[in-house]
C-alpha cells in the first residue's frame, strides 16, 4: 500500500482516533499532521508492515503522551471528539452528557485517558493496550480502574456532601 492510498482510505479513522484522544478537533489535526509527516518519511518501512494503520495509531498515541514531557501539564479542552455531524437530531440531554463525559475525560492524566480511549473507543484488550503503551497488562488495568473511579466520582448525579 502506498502512502497516498493509506492517507486516502485510513486518514478519517486515524483522525477520529486522534480527536478522541485529544478531546479537540484542532489539536487532533495537529497531532495527525505531525505524525503523518514522520510516517511519510518512513513509509518504505511502515508500508511493508502487516498493519500500517496500527503503527500509525501507535505513533499518534506516543505523540499524544509525549506532550506531557514537552510542556507543563494542562487540561485538554473537551470537544465533539471529531465525530462527523449526525444526520439524526441529537437530543440535548444526550449531547450534554457526552460533552460532560468528554470534559471529565480531558481532566484525567494522559495515560489513564489513553487507556480508557483505547479500551472503550478502540475496543482493544489489555494486552494490546499494554503493548501500545509499553507497560504490563496489570498496569493497564490499574490505569483503567483509577480513570473509571475518577469519572464515576465526577459524573455521579447525586449531590456531594460538603465538608
Protein language model features and the residues they cover:
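Short amphipathic alpha-helical boundary/capping segments
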Residues: 5, 100-108
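DNA-recognition helix of helix-turn-helix
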Residues: 133-157, 163
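Arg/Lys-rich amphipathic alpha helix in sigma70-family domain 2
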Residues: 47, 58-79, 94, 157
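Σ70-family region 2.3-2.4 aromatic/basic alpha-helix that recognizes the −10 promoter
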Residues: 36-40, 50-70, 144, 148
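Internal acidic/polar
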Residues: 66, 74-98, 103, 125
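Short helix-coil-helix linker/hinge
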Residues: 95, 105-113
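A short, charge-rich alpha-helical start-of-domain segment used by transcription regulators
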Residues: 1-16, 26-29, 40
Amino acid at each position: 500500500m502506498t502512502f497516498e492510498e493509506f492517507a486516502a482510505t485510513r486518514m478519517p479513522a486515524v483522525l477520529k482516533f486522534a480527536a478522541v484522544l485529544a478531546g479537540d478537533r484542532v489539536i487532533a489535526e495537529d497531532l495527525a499532521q505531525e505524525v503523518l509527516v514522520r510516517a511519510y518519511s518512513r513509509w518504505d518501512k511502515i508500508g511493508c508492515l502487516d498493519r500500517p494503520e496500527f503503527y500509525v495509531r501507535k505513533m499518534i498515541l506516543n505523540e499524544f503522551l509525549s506532550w506531557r514531557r514537552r510542556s507543563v501539564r494542562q487540561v485538554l479542552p473537551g470537544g465533539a471528539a471529531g465525530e462527523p455531524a449526525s444526520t439524526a437530531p441529537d437530543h440535548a440531554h444526550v449531547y450534554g452528557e457526552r460533552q460532560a463525559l468528554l470534559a471529565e475525560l480531558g481532566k484525567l492524566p494522559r495515560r489513564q485517558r489513553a487507556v480508557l480511549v483505547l479500551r472503550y473507543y478502540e475496543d482493544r484488550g489489555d494486552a494490546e493496550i499494554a503493548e501500545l503503551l509499553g507497560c504490563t497488562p496489570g498496569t493497564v488495568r490499574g490505569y483503567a480502574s483509577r480513570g473509571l473511579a475518577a469519572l464515576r466520582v465526577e459524573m455521579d448525579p447525586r449531590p456531594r456532601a460538603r465538608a
